[in-house]
A protein has these predicted regions:
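Amphipathic alpha-helical segments typified by the pilin-like N-terminal helix
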Residues: 1-27, 34-35
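Periplasmic/extracellular, small/polar-rich flexible segments of pilin-like filament-forming proteins
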Residues: 34-125
Length: 125
């Protein structure tokens, strides 16, 4: 019997793709987060685009291209101990990601076409 749209373990293929893409996106967003901390340390405010972060040494890398990762964020002058949100996505779709002092968490319950997760302090447009 063939498995249609599912893996042998019964997990939907779409979930596998989301998980794989989340891993790629999260890895890059952790880099963004690290440089945001550096930028905040130097400037007492957060960068509002990747170009500002690229001005730091060592420079942050470009987002992955396979799959392509898009990152949009607005975090004006905030306390880094608080949470903020990032919209990021790949060819699977755009989702909200929540950045905290403990890392980047996927918010698969909140696609980028919807409202920001209520637990995030900032909404991005």
């Amino acid at each position: 019997m063939a498995f249609v749209g599912k893996t042998a373990g019964g997990r939907p293929l779409e979930a596998n793709r989301r998980s794989s893409n989340d891993t790629i996106v999260q890895s890059y967003l952790r880099e963004v987060q690290k440089y945001q901390e550096m930028y905040y340390g130097f400037n007492r405010r957060y960068a509002q685009n990747l170009a500002q972060l690229k001005a730091l040494v060592p420079p942050i890398e470009d987002p992955p291209t396979t799959p392509p990762v898009t990152v949009r964020f607005v975090t004006p002058g905030v306390d880094y101990n608080r949470e903020y949100c990032v919209v990021a996505g790949t060819n699977v779709g755009q989702y909200w990601y929540q950045a905290t002092s403990k890392g980047v968490r996927v918010r698969t319950d909140a696609p980028a076409t919807g409202a920001a997760p209520t637990s995030c302090d900032f909404t991005l447009y």
